[in-house]
Amino acid sequence: MNATIAATDHSLPSVVLAELQKGGLSPQRLAQAEVFCPAFFARVDGSDIHLHTPVQWAAVVGGLLGFMQQRPAGRAVVRVLSPADMHAGRSLLQIVTDDMPFLIDTVSMVVSTSLQTHAVIHPVVVASRDAAGALLSLGGTAGQAESVMHFEIDRAADAAEQEQLKAQIEAALEDVRAAVNDWAAMRDKAL
């Protein structure tokens, strides 16, 4: 199915979900995908929908769902991938963290020091996790809002550049977390 047509008639999330079902997801992961797919594609810009085929989008969504399965409380998880089957010349930067202000701007600034950003997809989903950080469910009212960020960027040259970018993003997000957590105290001190 043509991804542009699918995006126009709002069926792409259903098509991608069907692709994920073919992959034999567990019932728990399938329930997560049913919540995540609409949230993810609601944040895909119309001009970006053509970047991938439905099968490629399913790989992106499935990969993100797998990546989201474990996250320590109060910490961001970050990865940089350069999959062979994506657009030539692109790497994927993916981040899952507590939802808070300044995330996209901060990550974009770090990336822009050496690479160009081609697409940003940023759904916010309610995630319920156990004490060890394992994902229990998505959606509903239990849990807390988490930012799931998917950046398509210029291809990182090698594993060393991927690791360097990952470390820079992690450090910047720790600074954001500290600033957001301290803003009220800083404001009170300034007044």
Describe the function of each predicted region.
Residues 2-191:
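Non-catalytic interaction/regulatory segments
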